[in-house]
């Protein structure tokens, strides 16, 4: 630690120490990243957050601004006198620094204003006589005291430095106290010096002068005499860091060990030593990205002299490592885990083109224990270093550094005093390391994440690997213990090439150093973006205003916007900063460095290449190769880049081979070729071609791999080979040469004997150094230098021939030793001092693109192929091969870095011979088709044609055939045909004649007698004949011949045809035809015109015949239909003589009647009514006629006898005892009872003995005050209790505790038991119902008028809400009206976050799955814990935590209203959460009631299953009902199906119309039972098994009688089935209405309700006898009555309702309702609705005017009452057309039902009935 800055007194030194300590402590407490420094080094809050850190409780920010402490920090030097452990300690109990802090507090009256710091003027350097332009610092805000006397501001002062009540001259009051303890220096101290005493400045290190205005020149360290050698002084312009993430370091360069002689100032070369030594008390505050708990960047600090400078001259950055005292952070680390992936790249060259192919290996994990680890299988070795090795040192063990020759110490941080002081053994260790078979890559990475640590745990990892591999590190983590490996890792993407000296690659922790030129001031740090250091998403383009095409990895804003990106962002995308026309090279203008596209600022003077290949997604299907300022996508052999340069396509996609394209392909044959030859990709990618080429190659189908190979862009698009090849050639020339050559060098083994001197590679980073732009009017040239891994650029000399000064980073030491040039063009030998290895100690690429070979007296450069030594003979430069004319005038030579290429002229082709290229002549004469019709002679770059006879030379140099036929007279008597080189005369064809060398047509029609029986038509070269009717053209079409019409059957089809010349005749017509008048056809004969045809019918003529129809009665047409024959009426089962015997006659029949029948009209037997005229059944019966007979209907007390023809008395006393309690006496037609005791009396109606009820009301009760209970023949007296009491076994009346039933009084009150009764004490917002047995909600909106003012009042359960009509307003409870909503204000009252936050989290809700693992069945994906656990859920959340049980405290807290109720989001009243019924159908709709419909009830839900399903409570689904278990198929085999069943019948049985019975269709008796065939009497009433009140007028069938008004049928009095039975429903095709009415729940046919009817309660009636109509959910039970009598016995007269029948017994004999069940509606619950009845049969919705009802289907809104009333569809004239045809309509609640008439069945679809088949 250096000594503090000296001053004139010791006390001042002490104050300086505390003065430096105070602001640092406050900065640590306050956070230096939140502060900005003003022009004199003080800190001010950078935002309102900084002010908030200092605000006292309850103070206003404006008032607190005067309390902000002024901070002072020296970022480049540690605080004197303090250890790093004290930096984070809070300042406590020190009156010295506290008084100093109070002295620095600004007065309350200070004003914040902006001032300009003094502008530093140009001054002459004391040694270099160079002008340095001082830069003015940007304007900053600072606190400045107004110019008023201190006494006027503070009043009278006391204490020291006070003169006359005011501060003495040179002193002023401090900012925080009223004492004159602050010295005044005018003018103020510069360069951040401090004013210690009046007019006395204490300067910072590196500055001197009265006002610290002079920069102390740097000193060189001379190891010969161990004394500092002064260098040119360096000035540093003051300027505060405006970014909260300021980075910076003070870098001092050291000259070589042997100082050269001082040349004249104008000729001196400034060549800094590449290994940097940092001196001076500098400290760099840096920020490392970390993933802390809050996601913020951690602040870390490094001390002086602990910075590692990369040994590469191209890597102009400083790597900051951990300080020595930070080692305690990793002392306990015994094991380090390193995960990396090796990559091996090889270079293949073919046909003059080279390509890179890289193959990644397996991801390797090595553990470093004790400082190093080794994997013998993979050949990799890693070193883990806990100490930093500086000045080019390398870590070779856990706590050991290998130091170069010019440094020493544990960290290589001390310079070597003398050359002979180097410790022994180090050099040998270094040589052993280099001679090994492995190479090393070095990475400096953070080991773990720490919160605000000043000593970051950075580790330096060296990976030794085979030379052909490179390494990519994924993870570096610490392992705390062997048994419990707790990893603390940082994932990184660090790439490094194999460098033997451990140069750091793209380390994301490399800071921006500022290398200082000799004689030039260090430039201020760059102005960093507010996004500096953040990683975000980089976008390549936008689509419809939205960012699109994101890259695959996160990048910084500088890397994104400086390379390929247009938009960038962390949480949202923003356009990249506008980039002006960027320079082609880096320039510095107005103090800012501008980099070209593809580069980013490395520091104030260097631009570093952006490695775009580190960003995923640029080269989609290709390999990415980084180039200078850009990148390149390369492809594997057989592939090439498309025009987008980012995708590899097959070289078949740009094949230039041409062939025929066929538009049709069938049966392997190609047809319809195109005219021109085209390529295969144009043919097959254009949807035109089906096949291509000479072999008829079929085009590949779209979507196949073959199609994508030739059509990578899809249908309608092809690639241009010229574009692709030109771009590839350009890429090879400008971009591929250097990277590929460098990789070739790296993979090439060194020559024999040079293994110990391997070539030194440059760092992978590329940087460009820029000179400062001159001022306007300066005529000096701008000097720009670039440096790259393969080509370090040089600055040429000026016009006067002076050698240009070397630039920093070239790494060429300045040496007075002589140079010896070896006779070679690429070897330079330089003599150096003893013990000086320039190839190692210097930059790794001292020779540039060549190999540096150390010599005893210097070094030599062996240049790579394509390079030559620079004229200065000190490094390799590109060899311009084009100067030697390698293309020999046959093409254009294009030079490239390290190579060249020839662009051959037409007529020449490129030939590559090894490393050379040349253009050779193309022999066009060897190509087919050249000089056709002549002789070809090849020439240089072209060819020449000599034409044969018959050809002529054309302009293009080709031979063209002469067409001799163009000359008239060539062939006077024939036709001339041209041929290649000649012609031929041919004779004219038939029909033509020669004329002037051509053939003309002959008109044959001019010849007489041609075309007899026709007309001649002349044609070109021939003629044809058009014949008359009856003639046809001859085969040669030159004559006409007769047509034989008789050869076709169409002539005379019903007769004989005779052919004649030109015509024909018909004869011998068939029966029914005759010959017409012209004899050419046989016409039909009308037989009906002749008399006597069809005498007993009507004759109808037909073609060729006739038929007899409409025969007379008793006749019918015979099978031939040509006569009417007699009908035998006596044949067949249905004889016309019913009740008699039939006898057939001609045209009629005769009836012979049986007894009981009589003949009517001689044709039928009619029943004789014996009951007319004679009294056969008198006097005790009524005569009823029957078919062929009669029977007697006897009066009560009489029975039929003698076959039913007589009535006789019934002895009632003989059959049963009709007189219980008495004696029976038979009488005529009746009986009488003689009662035995006085407790019975005869009935006046029936005469039976009836019990006398002694307990009936009478004046003198038989039991007095006791309760009388009647019994047969007697009675008993029972002690009775008042209501609310029950009788105990001992006879006492005990009070009934109604409150023992928890359901009494509901959920909104509690029960208070009283004697004989109880009362309900209701909660707030509820009141007792009129019955006093429950608590009902109080409608505050109706009771309290205008309770919400002008807002809408909405009543909720237990309270009310005030809602504003507009969403832009909110209700103010204090003012009582709506006011505009404040921005950001919450509508619901603010409550504690910790109480409300869990209820807002929505996660998965699970149900218990029987037999399966937990959390295997998801109820809902987006449910709160209350919605899940208060309803049907069993587990909730990502952790699948079980829901609390209903009897737990957690459940009562989560679900205070009980099961089925959830809190209403946003609804608060009087500070309490409102709860409402949970609609499980909405929350868990898809998981509930599958194969059915879910219906919400309060509380719970119900499942309405589809037909064929029943509800399963365990799975909450509707399961298939196995109908086959219910004997569904009679006489057949039942097969169950999902939701239905099917009956399989065995032959000859078939399935009837019901689908449930197999019947025999061959037997008529099976199809038509007797009671459906015969007609008989229908009885309307049956009493005591006696049928009475017959239906008079007509007889009916059994079905008609029972389904209309009858109760029995036929003479046997067959009883009809009960109307509530299944037999009646099947017989009459109606639903069991009585069964529906008997149930407490109104069932809809075809659906099952609830958890199954077996689970319904036995008693669906309440205490008042009214049935409960609420539907039962899967977990609910029927509501218990408010109270019950425990002493009630099962035998009491308690109304009991039997469970209704199963739904399977209700189907399927009904016509379903027309309307479907109402769909699920979402609306307000009844308790939330502002309508009195809650919109029953509809849903309640809120509108602007209030509330209204949205009615379900089948209901309509009644406007006056706001109620949904049923629509009577049966009376609606506008309803369905012909509603319930063939049946009658019955209106139901919300729908209607059709009942089909007998003989009709229900049809699917529209509601109507169809006749049975």
From Swiss-Prot:
SUPFAM superfamilies: EGF/Laminin, Growth factor receptor domain, TB module/8-cys domain. Residues 94-115, 226-243 are annotated as: Heparin-binding. Residues 257-266 have a biased composition (Pro residues). The modification Phosphoserine is found at residue 491. Its main location: secreted. Disulfide bonds join 185-195, 189-201, 203-212, 385-395, 389-401, 403-412, 538-560, 547-573, 561-576, 613-624, 619-633, 635-648, 661-683, 670-696, 684-699, 685-711, 839-852, 847-861, 863-876, 882-893, 887-902, 904-919, 925-936, 931-945, 947-959, 965-976, 971-985, 988-999, 1005-1016, 1011-1025, 1027-1040, 1046-1057, 1052-1066, 1069-1082, 1088-1099, 1094-1108, 1111-1124, 1130-1142, 1137-1151, 1153-1165, 1171-1183, 1177-1192, 1194-1207, 1213-1224, 1219-1233, 1235-1249, 1255-1268, 1263-1277, 1281-1293, 1299-1311, 1305-1320, 1322-1335, 1341-1353, 1348-1362, 1364-1378, 1405-1428, 1415-1440, 1429-1443, 1430-1455, 1481-1494, 1489-1503, 1505-1518, 1524-1534, 1529-1543, 1545-1558, 1578-1601, 1587-1613, 1602-1616, 1603-1628, 1729-1740, 1735-1749, 1751-1764, 1770-1785, 1780-1794, 1796-1809. Glycans are attached at residues 175, 328, 406, 603, 1161, 1301, 1422, 1560. It is found in: Secreted, Extracellular space, Extracellular matrix. Residues 1-35 form the signal peptide. Keywords: Disulfide bond, EGF-like domain, Extracellular matrix, Glycoprotein, Growth factor binding, Heparin-binding, Hydroxylation, Phosphoprotein, Repeat, Secreted, Signal. Residues 103-152, 220-305, 492-524, 730-761, 787-819, 1671-1717 are annotated as: Disordered. Residues 181-213, 381-413, 609-649, 835-877, 878-920, 921-960, 961-1000, 1001-1041, 1042-1083, 1084-1125, 1126-1166, 1167-1208, 1209-1250, 1251-1294, 1295-1336, 1337-1379, 1477-1519, 1520-1559, 1725-1765, 1766-1810 form the EGF-like domain. Residues 536-588, 659-711, 1403-1455, 1576-1628 form the TB domain. Residues 108-132, 293-302 have a biased composition (Polar residues). N-Glycosylated. Residues 1631-1813 are annotated as: C-terminal domain. InterPro entries: EGF-like_Ca-bd_dom (IPR001881), EGF-like_CS (IPR013032), EGF-like_dom (IPR000742), EGF-type_Asp/Asn_hydroxyl_site (IPR000152), EGF_Ca-bd_CS (IPR018097), Growth_fac_rcpt_cys_sf (IPR009030), NOTCH1_EGF-like (IPR049883), TB_dom (IPR017878). Belongs to the LTBP family. May play an integral structural role in elastic-fiber architectural organization and/or assembly. This is Latent-transforming growth factor beta-binding protein 2. It comes from Mus musculus.
């Amino acid at each position: 630690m250096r000594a503090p800055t000296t001053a004139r007194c010791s006390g001042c030194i002490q104050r300086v120490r505390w003065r430096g300590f105070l602001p640092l402590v406050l900065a640590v407490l306050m956070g230096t990243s939140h502060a900005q420094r003003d022009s004199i080094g003080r800190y001010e809050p950078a935002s309102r957050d900084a002010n908030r850190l200092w605000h006292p409780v309850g103070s206003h920010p404006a008032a607190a601004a005067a309390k902000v402490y002024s901070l002072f920090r020296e970022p480049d030097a540690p605080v004197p006198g303090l250890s790093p452990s004290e930096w984070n300690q809070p300042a406590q109990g020190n009156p010295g620094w506290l008084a100093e802090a109070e002295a620095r507090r600004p007065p309350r009256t200070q004003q914040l204003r902006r001032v300009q710091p003094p502008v530093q003027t140009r001054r002459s350097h004391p040694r270099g006589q160079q002008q340095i332009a001082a830069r003015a610092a940007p304007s900053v805000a600072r606190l400045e005291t107004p110019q008023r006397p201190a006494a006027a501001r503070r009043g009278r002062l006391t204490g020291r430095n006070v003169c006359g009540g005011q501060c003495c001259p040179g002193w002023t009051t401090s900012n925080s106290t009223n004492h004159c303890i602050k010295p005044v220096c005018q003018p103020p101290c510069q360069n951040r010096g401090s004013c210690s005493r009046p007019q006395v400045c204490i300067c910072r290190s590196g500055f001197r002068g009265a006002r610290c205005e002079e920069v102390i020149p740097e000193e060189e360290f001379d190891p010969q005499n161990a004394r500092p050698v002064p260098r040119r002084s360096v000035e540093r312009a003051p300027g505060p860091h405006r970014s909260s993430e300021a980075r910076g370091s003070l870098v001092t360069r050291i000259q070589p060990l042997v100082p050269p002689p001082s040349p004249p100032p104008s000729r001196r070369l400034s060549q800094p030593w590449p290994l940097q030594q940092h001196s001076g008390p500098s400290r760099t505050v840096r920020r490392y990205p970390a993933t802390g708990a809050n996601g913020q960047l951690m602040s870390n600090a490094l001390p002086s002299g602990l910075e590692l400078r990369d040994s590469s001259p191209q890597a102009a950055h400083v790597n900051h490592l951990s300080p020595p005292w930070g080692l305690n952070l990793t002392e306990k680390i015994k094991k380090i885990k390193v995960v990396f992936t090796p990559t091996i790249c090889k270079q293949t060259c073919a046909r003059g083109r080279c390509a890179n192919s890289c193959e990644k290996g397996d991801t390797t994990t090595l553990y470093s224990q004790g400082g190093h680890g080794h994997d013998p299988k993979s050949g990799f070795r890693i070193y883990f270093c806990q100490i930093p090795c500086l000045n080019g040192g390398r870590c070779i063990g856990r706590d050991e550094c290998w130091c170069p020759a010019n440094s020493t110490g544990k960290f290589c941080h001390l310079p070597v005093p003398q050359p002979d002081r180097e410790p022994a053994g180090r050099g040998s260790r270094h040589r052993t390391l280099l001679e090994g078979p492995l190479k090393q890559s070095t990475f400096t990475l953070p080991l773990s994440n720490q919160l605000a640590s000043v000593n970051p745990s950075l580790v330096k990892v060296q990976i030794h690997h085979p030379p052909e591999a490179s390494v990519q590190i994924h993870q570096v983590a610490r392992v705390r213990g062997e048994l419990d490996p707790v990893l603390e890792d940082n994932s990184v993407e660090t790439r490094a090439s194999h460098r033997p000296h451990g140069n750091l690659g793209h380390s994301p922790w490399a800071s921006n150093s500022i290398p200082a030129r000799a004689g030039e001031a260090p430039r201020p740090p760059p102005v960093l973006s507010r996004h500096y250091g953040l990683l975000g998403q980089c976008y390549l383009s936008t689509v419809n205003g939205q960012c699109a095409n994101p890259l695959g990895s996160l990048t910084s804003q500088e890397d994104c916007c400086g390379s390929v990106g247009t938009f960038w962002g962390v949480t949202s995308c923003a356009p990249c900063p506008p980039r002006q026309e960027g320079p082609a090279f880096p320039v510095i203008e107005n103090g800012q460095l501008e980099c070209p596209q593809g580069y980013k600022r490395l520091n104030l003077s260097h631009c570093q290449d952006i490695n775009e290949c580190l960003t995923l997604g640029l080269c989609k299907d290709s390999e990415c190769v980084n180039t200078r300022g850009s990148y390149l996508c390369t492809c594997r052999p057989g592939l090439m880049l498309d025009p987008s340069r980012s995708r590899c396509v097959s070289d078949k996609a740009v094949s230039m081979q041409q062939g025929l394209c066929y538009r049709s392909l069938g049966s392997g044959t190609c047809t319809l070729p195109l005219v021109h030859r085209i390529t295969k990709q144009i043919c097959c990618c254009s949807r035109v071609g089906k096949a291509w080429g000479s072999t008829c190659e079929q085009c590949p189908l779209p979507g196949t791999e073959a199609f994508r190979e030739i059509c990578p862009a899809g249908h309608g698009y092809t690639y241009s080979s010229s574009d692709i090849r030109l771009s590839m050639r350009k890429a090879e020339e400008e971009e591929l040469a250097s990277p590929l050559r460098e990789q070739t060098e790296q993979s090439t083994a060194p020559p024999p004997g040079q293994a110990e001197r391997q070539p030194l590679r440059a760092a992978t980073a590329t940087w460009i150094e820029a000179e400062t732009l001159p001022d306007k009017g300066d005529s000096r040239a701008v000097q720009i230098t670039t440096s790259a891994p393969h080509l370090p650029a040089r600055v040429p000399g000026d016009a006067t021939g002076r050698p240009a000064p070397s630039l920093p980073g070239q790494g060429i030491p300045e040496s007075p030793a002589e140079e010896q040039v070896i006779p070679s063009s690429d070897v330079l030998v330089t003599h150096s001092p003893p013990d000086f290895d320039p190839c190692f100690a210097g930059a790794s690429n001292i020779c540039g693109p060549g190999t540096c070979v150390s010599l005893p007296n210097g070094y030599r450069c062996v240049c790579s192929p394509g390079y030559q030594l620079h004229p200065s003979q000190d490094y390799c430069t590109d060899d311009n091969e084009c100067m030697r004319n390698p293309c020999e005038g046959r093409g254009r030579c294009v030079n490239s870095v390290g190579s060249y290429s020839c662009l051959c002229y037409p007529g020449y082709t490129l030939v590559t011979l090894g490393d050379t290229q040349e253009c050779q002549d193309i022999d066009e004469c060897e190509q087919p088709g050249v000089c056709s019709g002549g002789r070809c002679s090849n020439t240089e770059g072209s060819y020449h044609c000599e034409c044969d006879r018959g050809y002529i030379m054309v302009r293009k140099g080709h031979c063209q055939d002469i067409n001799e036929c163009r000359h008239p007279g060539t062939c006077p008597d024939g036709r001339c045909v041209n041929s290649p080189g000649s012609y031929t005369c041919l004779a004219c064809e038939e029909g033509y004649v020669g004329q002037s060398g051509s053939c003309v047509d002959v008109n044959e029609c001019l010849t007489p007698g041609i075309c007899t029986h026709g007309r001649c038509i002349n044609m070109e070269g021939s003629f044809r004949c058009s014949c008359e009717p009856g003639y046809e053209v001859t085969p040669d079409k030159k004559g006409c011949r007769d047509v034989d019409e008789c050869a076709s059957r169409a002539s005379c089809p019903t007769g004989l045809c005779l052919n004649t010349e030109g015509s024909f005749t018909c004869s011998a017509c068939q029966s029914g035809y005759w010959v017409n008048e012209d004899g050419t056809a046989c016409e039909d004969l009308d037989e009906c015109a002749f008399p006597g045809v069809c005498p007993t019918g009507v004759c109808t003529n037909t073609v060729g015949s006739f038929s007899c129809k409409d025969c007379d009665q008793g006749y019918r047409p015979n099978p031939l239909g040509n006569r009417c024959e007699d009908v035998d009426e006596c044949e067949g089962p249905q004889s016309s003589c019913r009740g008699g015997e039939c006898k057939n006659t001609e045209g009629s029949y005769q009836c012979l009647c049986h007894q009981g029948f009589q003949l009517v009209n001689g044709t039928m037997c009619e029943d004789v009514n014996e009951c007319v005229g004679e009294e056969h059944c008198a006097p005790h019966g009524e005569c009823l006629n029957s078919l062929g007979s009669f029977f007697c209907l006897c009066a009560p007390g009489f029975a039929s006898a003698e076959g039913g023809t007589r009535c006789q008395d019934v002895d009632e006393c003989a059959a049963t005892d009709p007189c219980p309690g008495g004696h029976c006496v038979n009488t005529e037609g009746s009986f009488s009872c003689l009662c035995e005791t006085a407790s019975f009396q005869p009935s006046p109606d029936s005469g039976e003995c009836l019990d006398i009820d002694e307990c009936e009301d009478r004046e003198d009760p038989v039991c007095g005050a006791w309760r009388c209970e009647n019994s047969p023949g007697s009675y008993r007296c029972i002690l009775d209790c008042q209501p609310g009491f029950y009788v105990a076994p001992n006879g006492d009346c005990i009070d009934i505790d109604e409150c023992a039933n928890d359901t009494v009084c509901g959920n909104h009150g509690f029960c208070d038991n009283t004697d004989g009764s109880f009362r309900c004490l209701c909660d707030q917002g509820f009141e007792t119902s009129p019955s006093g047995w429950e608590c009902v909600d109080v409608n505050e909106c109706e009771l309290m008028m205008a309770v919400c003012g002008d807002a809408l009042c909405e009543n909720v359960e237990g309270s009310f809400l005030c809602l504003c009509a507009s969403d832009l307003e909110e209700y103010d409870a204090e003012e009582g009206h709506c006011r505009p909503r404040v921005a950001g204000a919450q509508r619901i009252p603010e409550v504690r976050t910790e109480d409300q936050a869990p209820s807002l989290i929505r996660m998965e809700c699970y149900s218990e799955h029987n037999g399966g693992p937990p959390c295997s069945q998801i109820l809902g994906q987006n449910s709160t814990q209350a919605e899940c656990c208060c309803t049907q859920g069993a587990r909730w959340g990502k952790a699948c935590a079980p829901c609390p049980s209903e009897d737990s405290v957690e459940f009562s807290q989560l679900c205070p209203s009980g099961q089925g109720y959830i809190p209403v989001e946003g609804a608060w009243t009087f500070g309490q959460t409102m709860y409402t019924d949970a609609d499980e159908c909405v929350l868990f709709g898809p998981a509930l009631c599958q194969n059915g419909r879910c219906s919400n009830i309060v509380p719970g839900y119900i499942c309405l299953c589809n037909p064929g399903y029943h509800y399963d409570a365990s799975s909450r689904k509707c399961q298939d009902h196995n109908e086959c278990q219910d004997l569904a198929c009679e006489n057949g085999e039942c097969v169950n199906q999902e939701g239905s069943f099917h009956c399989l019948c065995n032959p000859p049985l078939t399935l009837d119309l019901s689908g449930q019975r197999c019947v025999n269709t061959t037997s008529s008796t099976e199809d038509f039972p007797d009671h459906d065939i015969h007609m008989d009497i229908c009885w309307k009433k049956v009493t005591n098994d006696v049928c009475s009140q017959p239906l008079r007028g007509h007889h009916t069938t059994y079905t008609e009688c029972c389904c209309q008004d009858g109760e029995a049928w036929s003479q046997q009095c067959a009883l009809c089935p009960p109307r509530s039975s299944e037999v009646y429903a099947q017989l009459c095709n109606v639903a069991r209405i009585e069964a529906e009415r008997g149930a407490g729940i109104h069932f809809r046919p075809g659906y099952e309700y609830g958890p199954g009817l077996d689970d319904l309660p036995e008693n669906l009636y309440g205490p008042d006898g009214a049935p409960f109509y609420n539907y039962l959910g899967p977990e609910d039970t029927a509501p218990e009555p408010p109270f019950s009598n425990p002493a009630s016995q099962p035998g009491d007269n308690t109304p009991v309702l039997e469970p209704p029948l199963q739904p399977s017994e209700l189907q399927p004999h009904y016509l379903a309702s027309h309307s479907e069940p109402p769909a699920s509606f979402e609306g307000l619950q009844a308790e939330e609705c502002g309508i009195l009845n809650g919109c029953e049969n509809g849903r309640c919705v809120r509108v602007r005017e209030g509330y209204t009802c949205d009615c379900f289907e089948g209901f309509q809104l009644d406007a006056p009452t706001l109620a949904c009333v049923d629509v009577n569809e049966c009376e609606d004239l506008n309803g369905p057309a012909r509603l319930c045809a063939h049946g009658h309509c019955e209106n139901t609640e919300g729908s209607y039902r059709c009942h089909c008439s007998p003989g009709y069945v229900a049809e699917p679809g529209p509601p109507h009935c169809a006749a049975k088949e």
